[in-house]
């Protein structure tokens, strides 16, 4: 394993196990340097194991955002290059962490793995950042031209924009990171990953000419901005193209559920 949390060689599972254990047991394993195991507790709300932490360690930059700090604890490990849907500020508390970031447009050069079976929730690059196999993944050489890396010590923090790919290497017997995720969309907004899944089920099965036609339609209704798509439609007649409100989002969600069930 060499500290790399990843898929099994046959991609029929993972090269690590998942278990629930008391926090004290995790600390005991990390305190025993002769244990030899790679141990990792990821993305745990501080309120679950460190009550009062959030109140004593507020992050003013995101104080107004609907977020709560999460804590990551382990020893030396490598987390594959992936992206998160939320903006992120990550703060190193103990140990050293090296972050390598790639802009979203490098997705094709990063060779992402499965969408529905993932190491930690989001698609992960199949390239080993510490030892890239450029014969198997030749386009990764282009991705490296766009990479940005930073090595963080205790007290350092890094801002990772939403959808930026990032790989993380942790070193040290006791490594701790606290991060703050947030989004600038309403809490009841849908996840773009769900939209991706629906698109794979529908648009992804169409011939190329129809896929390109749908690209133009999505550009008009989604990517060009809502106002450009509706400025010629009377406001009272805009329907789901109208101004986004909690009521409208609820209606849209119910509509989508009915449509998916009907198919």
Give a label for each model feature:
Residues 1-157, 167-263:
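N-terminal accessory scaffold of Fe(II)-dependent oxygenases
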């Amino acid at each position: 394993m060499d500290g790399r949390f990843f898929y099994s060689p046959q991609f029929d599972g993972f090269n690590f196990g998942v278990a629930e254990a008391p926090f004290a047991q995790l600390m005991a394993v990390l305190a025993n340097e002769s244990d030899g195991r790679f141990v990792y507790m990821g993305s745990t709300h501080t309120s679950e194991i460190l009550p009062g932490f959030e109140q004593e360690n507020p992050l003013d930059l995101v104080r107004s955002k609907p977020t709560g700090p999460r804590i990551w604890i382990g020893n030396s490990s490598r987390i594959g290059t992936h992206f998160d849907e939320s903006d992120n500020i990550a703060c190193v508390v103990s140990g050293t962490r090296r972050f390598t970031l790639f802009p979203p447009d490098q997705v094709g050069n990063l060779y992402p793995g499965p969408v529905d079976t993932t190491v930690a929730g989001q698609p992960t690059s199949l390239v080993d950042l510490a030892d890239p196999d450029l014969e198997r993944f030749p386009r990764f050489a282009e991705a490296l031209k766009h990479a940005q890396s930073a090595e963080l010590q205790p007290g350092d923090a890094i801002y990772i924009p939403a959808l930026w790919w990032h790989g993380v290497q942790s070193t040290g017997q006791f490594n701790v990171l606290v991060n703050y995720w947030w989004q600038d969309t309403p809490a009841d907004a849908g996840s773009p990953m769900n939209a991706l899944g629906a698109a794979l089920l529908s648009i992804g099965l169409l011939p190329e000419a129809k896929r390109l036609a749908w690209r133009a339609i999505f550009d008009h209704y989604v990517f060009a901005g809502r106002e450009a798509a509706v400025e010629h439609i009377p406001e009272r007649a805009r329907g789901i193209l109208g101004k986004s409100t909690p009521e409208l989002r609820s209606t849209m969600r119910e509509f989508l559920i009915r449509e998916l069930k009907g198919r």
